[in-house]
Structure formats: C-alpha cells, structure tokens
Amino acid sequence: MSALTNLLQSIEKITLTNRDKGTSFENLMVQYFLNEPKYAELYTEVLSYADWVEKYGEKLNITDKRDYGIDLVAVTMGGEFHPIQCKNYNTTKIQKKDIDSFLGGSGKSYFSYRYIVASTDDWTDNAKSSLLDAHPPVATISLLDLEGSLIDCDAKTRPIC
C-alpha cells in the first residue's frame, strides 16, 4: 500500500465528520498543488474559496463567499484563476449530481480552467460526459494521478504526506 493510500486511510479514521474529512483532503490538495512540480511551476498560491474571495473578490466584484462547490482556487503566475473541487470519495463512485454545483459555480468568466481532484478513479458515465467540451475546460486529477506524484511521500520530510 502506498504512503498516500495510508494517509487517506488515516484521514478517514481520525476525522469525526464528513466535513472534517473533506477539509483535511482540501488541505492536502493545497500542498499537492504547491509542491507537485507540474503544478508548482504554474501556481503562485492556492487558497480556500473564502480566502480567495477575501483577497480578490473586490477586484472581480464578488462579495458572496458561498462556494457553490468550489473548494480551492489556484492563482497562476500570469494572474489567472483556476477553481478546484476536492472529492474525498475513497469508496464511493462520483456521480454527476456530486459535481453539478461545481460546474455551475465555476463556469464564470473570471475562471479560465478548472480541476476536480478525487480520491477515487470510479466515475459514472454521466459524470464523465458532463466534463466533455465544458467551458472553461475541466481536468480531473484521479487517485491514480495522485499516486503517481513526484512528491516522495516516504521521505523523512514530507511536504504533503
């Protein structure tokens, strides 16, 4: 079993609520986007949606901090905004209804690219098809992708794991 799988199982065991489980996974994904070389070269910061609204909302005329399924927002070196939804669904299949609010809430002109990060590789066909030809585009980062991270989760100094 991989270090990441062990960590996800630890989160599952030690968190008391689904909300805590989700928040722990979101915090892990902040570190993933800031430390995984592919993303670390692209992003200057990754913020919770509420913190992003606090920092950039006035400039974009956004006052509502309700996230509508957006958990995090990554800010590119060029100043673009990429919303991220984090799904910690270890044993559950992701259905279209699980991502509908994110797709609606993140389909704004100030977002140029979107991510859904999931701790599963199991998606319904309807969920997969809802991402095709979406605008802005949506990329998925699956458990398999996370497992293939270049971050050494077995190292003594663990930036995210």
Regions found by a protein language model. Name each.
Residues 21-110, 119-129:
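Catalytic centers of nucleases
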Residues 4-16, 49, 53-62, 100, ...:
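ATP-dependent helicase/translocase motor core
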Residues 1-23, 27-31:
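Glycine/serine-rich loop-strand microenvironments at binding/catalytic pocket rims
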